Design a protein with these regions (language model features):
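Specific transmembrane alpha-helical segments of multi-pass solute transporters/efflux pumps
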Residues: 17, 21-22, 50-99, 135, ...
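Glycine-/small-residue-enriched transmembrane alpha-helix faces in small-molecule transporters
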Residues: 1-36, 85, 144-171, 195, ...
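Transmembrane alpha-helices of multi-pass small-molecule transport proteins
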Residues: 31-78, 105-106, 161-165, 182-203, ...
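Transmembrane alpha-helical segments that form core, pore/gating elements
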Residues: 23, 49, 106-108, 112, ...
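C-terminal transmembrane-helix exit sites in multi-pass transporters
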Residues: 48-58, 103-127, 254-273
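Hydrophobic transmembrane alpha-helices of multi-pass small-molecule transport proteins
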Residues: 49, 69, 118-140, 193, ...
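Helix-helix packing/entry segments at the starts of transmembrane helices
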Residues: 38-40, 80, 94-101, 168-190, ...
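Membrane-interface helix-cap regions at the ends of transmembrane helices
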Residues: 20, 24-27, 31, 45-61, ...
Length: 288
């Protein structure tokens, strides 16, 4: 398959996988704390990747390991806990929509930190996207007083972390095999995640049936939604551009929205408008 066709196939697969991740986080939080959920997500991913990719890290040089560690922190470690904490207060559909700010943040960071030039339509897109996110958050806060929309800031911070990760990979690890990067990421994070899981009191509640059910959801999230998805994502970055790769977040809210409907989540008409405004902004920022 040609790279032009392959990148669209990978984009579609990623949108289905990551669009389903938010409902898995929501279900996992029924029996787990955010720290436990984030730690288990990393641990399940690490165990899976060690089994299939332990030989792939031998090709990494000392200088590459530095950037692998950085991408592990920004691309996985921080977001894993921020998303889990955010979904204790806001619904999974809104979380997925706010995550679609990632391409905008990728563009901004690319300009400010990595010297990537921008065009007028991209700047306009950034402004429109920010307007949409503000509309979404403030309307959600007024219509869902039981939810704490200050936690939406955690999702925005996570999207900035993702944007940092994408730019680092494109600039410093463009020729490294995706499996090597992904396996290296989770080997770096395995011990910190185990320490946090132990300190969270997880092993005192592991026998509870509700906790075991939640672990099943997070095992799927860790292996498919994190381990396999990251391999696909890193390949997509190398085949395309940082902004195209992060455009997967255009499609993620659509998948997440349908999962949310099945779980009795509802968005207000104004939130739909906010989501649409975000997508317009993202489209303009990605347009060449």
């Amino acid at each position: 398959m040609e790279s032009k066709q392959l990148k669209w196939v990978l984009l579609t697969i990623l949108s289905l996988i990551w669009g389903s991740s938010f409902i898995l986080i929501k279900k996992g939080l029924i029996g787990l704390t955010p720290i436990q959920l984030g730690s288990l997500r990393i641990i399940f991913s690490a165990l899976f990747l060690v089994l299939i990719g332990y030989k792939s890290v031998s090709v990494l040089t000392k200088s590459q390991w530095k950037y692998v560690a950085l991408t592990a922190i920004f691309g996985t470690f921080i977001p894993a806990y921020l998303f889990a904490l955010a979904e204790t207060e806001i619904d999974s559909s809104s979380t997925a929509i706010l995550n679609s700010l990632t391409p905008l943040n990728t563009l901004v960071l690319g300009m400010l930190a990595f010297g990537i030039p921008f065009k007028r339509n991209q700047f306009i897109g950034i402004c429109i996207g920010l307007l949409g996110s503000i509309l979404l958050v403030f309307n959600g806060a007024s219509n869902h007083p039981e939810q704490n929309y200050y936690y939406a800031l955690l999702v925005i911070i996570a999207s900035i972390c993702y944007a940092t990760n994408v730019n680092l990979i494109k600039k410093y690890l463009p020729s490294v095999a995706p499996l090597s990067i992904t396996t290296g990421n989770f080997l770096t994070l395995l011990i910190p995640a185990l320490v946090l899981l132990y300190c969270s009191g997880f092993f005192e509640i592991v026998a509870i049936s509700e906790v075991q059910t939640a672990m099943g959801y997070i095992a799927i999230l860790g292996i498919v939604g994190t381990g396999i998805a990251n391999i696909i994502f890193f390949k997509l970055i190398q085949l395309s551009s940082p902004v195209f790769a992060t455009s997967v977040t255009y499609l993620i809210p659509i998948v997440a929205f349908f999962w949310g409907l099945l779980d009795n989540e509802m968005l207000t008409p104004i939130q739909f408008v906010g989501a649409f405004v975000i997508l317009i902004g993202v489209y303009l920022s990605a347009k060449k």
